[in-house]
Every structure is written in structure tokens, then in C-alpha cells.
A protein has these predicted regions:
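Alpha-helical transmembrane segments of multipass membrane proteins
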Residues: 23, 27, 31, 60, ...
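Membrane-helix interface segments
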Residues: 44-45, 159-160, 187-188
Length: 205
């Protein structure tokens, strides 16, 4: 029986796969756009941005893993028609995301210089990285929340919302960063504010 072709299941799988693929493509295109803007700021800023991206990746990974757990929990309980568990799981997931966002803010803000020194030794590069981390760490609670929300919507099968919100997020990052850097002459400090605009836009979307 496991070889029986299920047309409706195939359509659903393709729809989910397409939405997920487009979401990932959108994120990567946004990162390319931001990197292109960073490259106009000089070698030191580009080096600092490379280092802080690694720190960001470490910071975001637990947030994403909590969101993946929320996705699995939502999907299982939606299938079981346990809306009460879905509500409780969603609430607990957001609480965990928020607590983690606060903790990682403290770590990255207080130890910004030490974290940068793990990757680079040049004082100018470290200075740029510390500036970035002091600003972005304050905002870490926002991606924690947006990751939790995306985990929820993926779990209930509404991937269009996650696709649209990711498109808004990455689009606003580039649209805000470009004039701040290329027109107003801001440095690496412009990037956290462009990310802030993206995360707020993501929540609104």
C-alpha cells in the first residue's frame, strides 16, 4: 500500500517545497544585497562584517532550533486536532525565544570585544565589530520572536506567510541600508538599523 500514488499529497509536498525554496532564495539574495553594500565601506568594515556574521550565526542558531521544535509541535498537534496543545506550545515557544533573546543580548553586548578577538586581531576591525555588536545585540529579541512566529506558521502549513515575511524582511534591509550607507555616508552602524527595519516589517507583514 505504501506504493500507492497520492496526487493530493504530491501537490501539497510540491507547494510546501516551492514555498520553502523561495523563502531560502529570498534570504540569500537579501544577504548578497547587504554584502554588496558592505563592500563599498572598505576592507576593514568588510572584514568586521565577516566576523560579526559568524557571531550572528551562533547567536541565531538556538532561536532557529526552538522555531523548528515549534514547527514539529504545531504540525503534530494540528494533525491530532489538539488546539489546546498548539496554544500552549506556541506560548511556551515564544517565552523560550524571548528568554534566549535577552540572554544572548547580554552576552554579545558585554563581551563584544572578546568575541571579536576570537576571529580578528586588527584593532580597527575589532572596533567596527564592537560597534555593530553593541547595536545588533539590543535587537536580538526581535529575530527570536520572528523565528518563533515563523515556526508556528510552518507548523500549521501556512508557508505563504513565512515567504512574504521573509521577502519583506530582506527587502527592507537592503532598501534601508543602501541610502544610509551610499547617500548619508553611515558606516557599519547602519546595518543594525536596516535589520531593525526588516524585522519590524516582518512582524507587520
Amino acid at each position: 500500500k505504501w506504493l500507492i500514488f497520492d496526487r493530493s499529497l504530491l501537490k501539497r509536498t510540491i507547494a510546501y517545497g516551492w514555498a520553502s525554496a523561495m523563502q531560502q532564495a529570498t534570504v540569500q539574495l537579501g544577504k548578497i544585497g547587504v554584502q554588496a553594500i558592505v563592500n563599498t565601506m572598505g576592507v576593514s568594515v568588510a572584514a568586521a562584517f565577516t566576523a560579526v556574521n559568524r557571531i550572528d550565526d551562533f547567536a541565531y542558531t538556538p532561536e532557529q532550533n526552538i522555531a523548528h521544535a515549534m514547527t514539529a509541535l504545531m504540525a503534530q498537534n494540528k494533525g491530532a486536532k489538539r488546539n489546546d496543545r498548539m496554544r500552549e506550545g506556541f506560548r511556551c515557544g515564544l517565552v523560550l525565544e524571548t528568554i534566549y533573546g535577552i540572554l544572548i543580548f547580554i552576552v554579545c553586548f558585554v563581551f563584544a570585544r572578546h568575541l571579536m578577538m576570537l576571529f580578528v586581531k586588527d584593532e580597527e576591525v575589532i572596533g567596527h565589530g564592537v560597534t555593530y555588536l553593541h547595536l545588533i545585540s539590543i535587537m536580538y529579541i526581535l529575530p527570536a520572536i520572528t523565528n518563533g512566529l515563523q515556526g508556528f506558521f510552518r507548523g500549521i502549513g501556512d508557508l505563504k506567510i513565512t515567504l512574504i515575511s521573509s521577502f519583506v524582511n530582506m527587502g527592507l534591509r537592503v532598501l534601508v541600508a543602501a541610502p544610509l550607507v551610499l547617500v548619508c555616508g553611515f558606516g557599519i552602524e547602519a546595518l543594525p538599523f536596516s535589520y531593525l527595519a526588516g524585522w519590524i516589517g516582518m512582524l507587520v507583514a
